[in-house]
C-alpha cells in the first residue's frame, strides 16, 4: 500500500503554468476517474485551486501519474517536471494535513483551503474514486485541520488588509452584524471586505463607486445597495462603518463632509478605515470628535504583529500534523499486517485442504490408516516449515543476525 502526492503550487510555478495544469469544475469528475484508472487501487483525489493543483493517489506509480497529468493537459514533460513536487507514504500524509491546515498556503493559516480540500473529496466520492484508505486519509485530515484551528491561534489574527479592516470593526463594535456599512470602491479589496462582512452577519451594506454598473455587479452577490460617488453625502450620515479603497488620486471624503455627517448622526461614533494608496480620506478627519480614522499603515502594523503570532502558532500546528501523520501510518501498517495474516492463513488452509483430500483418497482406496496419518503429518510439517527454513538459511548465510533473531522470535524458538 503506497500513498503518493504529486503537485504544483504558487511556490514552484508561475500563474501561467498553474492555469495550464488546473482542472475546471465541469471536467474534474471525469479527470478523477481517468486518474484513478491509472492506480492499482482505483483511488484518487484531485485538489485544484488558483494556487495549487495536487493529485493524491493510493497504489499509484509516480512516473505514471506525472505522465497522466502531462497527457491530460497536453503539456511537455520539460515544462512541467521542474515545477512538480512529490511525496510518498507518511510524507504524503503530512503534506495533505499541512495543506488542509493552511500551513502551505500563500497566506499562512488561511481557512479557505480546508473548504476547497473538502470539496475535492466530495467530488472524488461522487466520481467513485474513494475507497477505504483515501477515505480514512481525508477524514483524518479534516479532523487534524479542525484540531489545528482549535488548539492553536493560527486563524485568530488577521493577515490581509481586508480581513484586518473587518477585524478592527469587530473589536470596536460589540455587535458588528447590526451596523450599517458604507464601502467606497468596488475593486478586489473592497469585494473581499464585503465577503468578510457578510460572513460576520452584516446585512446593511452600501457600495459607492465611480461607475454604478461595477458596484451593481458586486452588490448582487452580497445583497448590498449600489450608489455613485456623488451620492455619498446622502448616505454617509447613516454609516456606522466606512471602509474605502479606490484608485482616486484625490481624497474622496473630506473633513467637512464627515463633520457634517457626524452632526446629522447626533455625534454617534463613526469608524473610518482608509486602505487606499494614495489616501481616500483626508487625514484631518482624525481630528474630529467621534470620528475614528485608521489608515493602511495602521493595518499593516497590526498585520505584521499578527503574522508573527501566526508563525508561532504554525510551529505548534507542525507538531500536530507530524504526530497525526505518524498515527495514520500506524493504521496503514495495521492494515498491511491484517492483509499479511489473512494471506498466510489462507495459504496454510489451502495446504491443509490439499493434503487432507489426498489422505482421504488413500483411505478410500484401502491404504493403511496409520501410514496415511503419518504421511499426512510429515507432508504438512514439510510444507509449513519450508518457507521459514529457507528464510532462516538465507539469514544465516548472510550473517544477518538481526533478521535471524526476528525469525527465531516469530517462530517461537527462543521460548524453548
UniProtKB/Swiss-Prot annotation:
- Entry binding sites for substrate: 49-52, 105, 110-112, 116
Gene Ontology biological-process entries: protoporphyrinogen IX biosynthetic process from glutamate
Which residues are noted in the entry as NADP(+)-binding?
Answer: 185-190
Site description Important for activity, residues in chain: 95
Q: Return the Gene3D superfamilies for the record.
A: Glutamyl-tRNA reductase, N-terminal domain, NAD(P)-binding Rossmann-like Domain
Q: SUPFAM superfamilies attached here?
A: Glutamyl tRNA-reductase catalytic, N-terminal domain (SSF69742), Glutamyl tRNA-reductase dimerization domain (SSF69075), NAD(P)-binding Rossmann-fold domains (SSF51735)
Query: Which reactions fall under this protein's catalytic activity?
Result: (S)-4-amino-5-oxopentanoate + tRNA(Glu) + NADP(+) = L-glutamyl-tRNA(Glu) + NADPH + H(+)
Q: What pathway or pathways are given for this protein in its record? A: Porphyrin-containing compound metabolism; protoporphyrin-IX biosynthesis; 5-aminolevulinate from L-glutamyl-tRNA(Glu): step 1/2
What are the transmembrane regions?
none
Which GO MF terms does the UniProt record name? glutamyl-tRNA reductase activity; NADP binding
Entry's Pfam families? Answer: GlutR_dimer, GlutR_N, Shikimate_DH
The active site consists of 50
Its keywords, alphabetically, are:
NADP, Oxidoreductase, Porphyrin biosynthesis
Q: Could you tell me the EC number(s) of this protein?
A: 1.2.1.70
Q: What class of enzyme is it?
A: oxidoreductase
Its domain description in UniProt is: Possesses an unusual extended V-shaped dimeric structure with each monomer consisting of three distinct domains arranged along a curved 'spinal' alpha-helix. The N-terminal catalytic domain specifically recognizes the glutamate moiety of the substrate. The second domain is the NADPH-binding domain, and the third C-terminal domain is responsible for dimerization.
Q: How does it assemble?
A: Homodimer.
Q: What does the UniProt function comment say about this protein?
A: Catalyzes the NADPH-dependent reduction of glutamyl-tRNA(Glu) to glutamate 1-semialdehyde (GSA).
PANTHER family reported in the protein's UniProt record: GLUTAMYL-TRNA REDUCTASE
* Family statement: Belongs to the glutamyl-tRNA reductase family.
- Misc. comment: During catalysis, the active site Cys acts as a nucleophile attacking the alpha-carbonyl group of tRNA-bound glutamate with the formation of a thioester intermediate between enzyme and glutamate, and the concomitant release of tRNA(Glu). The thioester intermediate is finally reduced by direct hydride transfer from NADPH, to form the product GSA.
- What's the protein name? Glutamyl-tRNA reductase
> What organism does the record attribute this protein to?
Shewanella baltica (strain OS155 / ATCC BAA-1091)
State the gene name recorded for this protein: hemA
Amino acid at each position: 500500500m503506497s500513498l503518493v502526492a504529486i503537485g504544483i503550487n504558487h511556490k514552484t510555478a508561475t500563474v501561467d503554468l498553474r492555469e495550464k495544469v488546473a482542472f475546471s469544475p465541469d471536467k474534474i469528475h471525469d479527470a478523477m476517474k481517468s486518474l484513478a484508472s491509472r492506480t492499482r487501487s482505483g483511488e484518487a483525489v484531485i485538489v485544484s485551486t488558483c494556487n495549487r493543483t495536487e493529485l493524491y493517489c493510493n497504489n499509484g506509480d509516480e512516473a505514471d501519474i506525472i505522465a497522466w497529468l502531462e497527457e491530460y493537459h497536453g503539456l511537455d514533460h520539460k515544462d512541467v517536471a521542474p515545477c512538480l513536487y512529490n511525496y510518498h507514504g507518511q510524507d504524503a500524509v503530512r503534506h495533505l494535513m499541512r495543506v488542509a491546515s493552511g500551513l502551505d498556503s500563500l497566506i499562512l493559516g488561511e481557512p479557505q483551503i480546508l473548504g476547497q480540500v473538502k470539496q475535492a473529496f466530495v467530488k472524488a466520492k461522487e466520481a467513485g474514486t474513494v475507497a477505504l484508505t483515501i477515505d480514512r486519509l481525508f477524514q483524518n485530515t479534516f479532523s487534524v485541520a479542525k484540531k489545528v484551528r482549535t488548539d492553536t491561534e493560527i486563524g485568530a489574527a488577521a493577515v490581509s488588509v481586508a480581513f484586518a479592516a473587518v477585524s478592527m470593526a469587530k473589536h470596536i463594535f460589540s455587535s458588528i452584524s447590526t451596523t450599517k456599512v458604507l464601502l467606497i470602491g468596488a475593486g478586489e479589496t473592497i469585494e473581499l471586505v464585503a465577503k468578510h462582512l457578510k460572513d460576520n452577519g452584516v446585512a446593511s451594506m452600501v457600495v459607492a463607486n465611480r461607475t454604478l454598473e461595477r458596484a451593481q455587479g458586486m452588490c448582487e452577490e452580497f445583497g448590498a445597495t449600489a450608489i455613485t460617488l456623488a451620492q455619498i453625502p446622502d448616505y454617509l450620515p447613516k454609516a456606522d462603518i466606512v471602509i474605502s479603497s479606490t484608485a482616486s488620486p484625490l481624497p474622496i471624503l473630506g473633513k467637512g463632509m464627515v463633520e457634517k455627517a457626524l452632526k446629522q448622526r447626533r455625534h454617534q461614533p463613526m469608524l473610518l478605515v482608509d486602505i487606499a494608496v494614495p489616501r481616500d480620506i483626508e487625514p484631518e478627519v482624525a481630528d474630529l470628535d467621534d470620528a475614528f480614522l485608521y489608515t493602511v499603515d495602521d493595518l499593516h502594523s497590526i498585520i505584521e504583529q499578527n503574522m508573527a503570532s501566526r508563525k508561532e502558532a504554525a510551529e505548534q500546528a507542525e507538531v500536530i500534523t507530524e504526530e497525526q501523520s505518524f498515527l495514520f501510518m500506524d493504521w496503514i501498517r495495521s492494515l498491511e499486517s491484517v492483509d499479511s495474516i489473512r494471506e498466510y492463513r489462507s495459504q496454510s488452509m489451502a495446504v491443509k485442504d490439499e493434503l487432507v483430500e489426498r489422505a482421504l483418497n488413500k483411505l478410500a482406496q484401502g491404504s493403511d490408516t496409520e501410514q496415511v496419518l503419518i504421511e499426512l503429518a510429515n507432508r504438512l510439517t514439510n510444507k509449513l516449515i519450508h518457507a521459514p527454513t529457507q528464510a532462516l538459511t538465507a539469514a544465516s548465510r548472510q550473517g544477518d543476525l538481526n533478521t535471524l533473531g526476528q525469525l527465531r522470535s516469530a517462530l517461537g524458538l527462543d521460548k524453548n
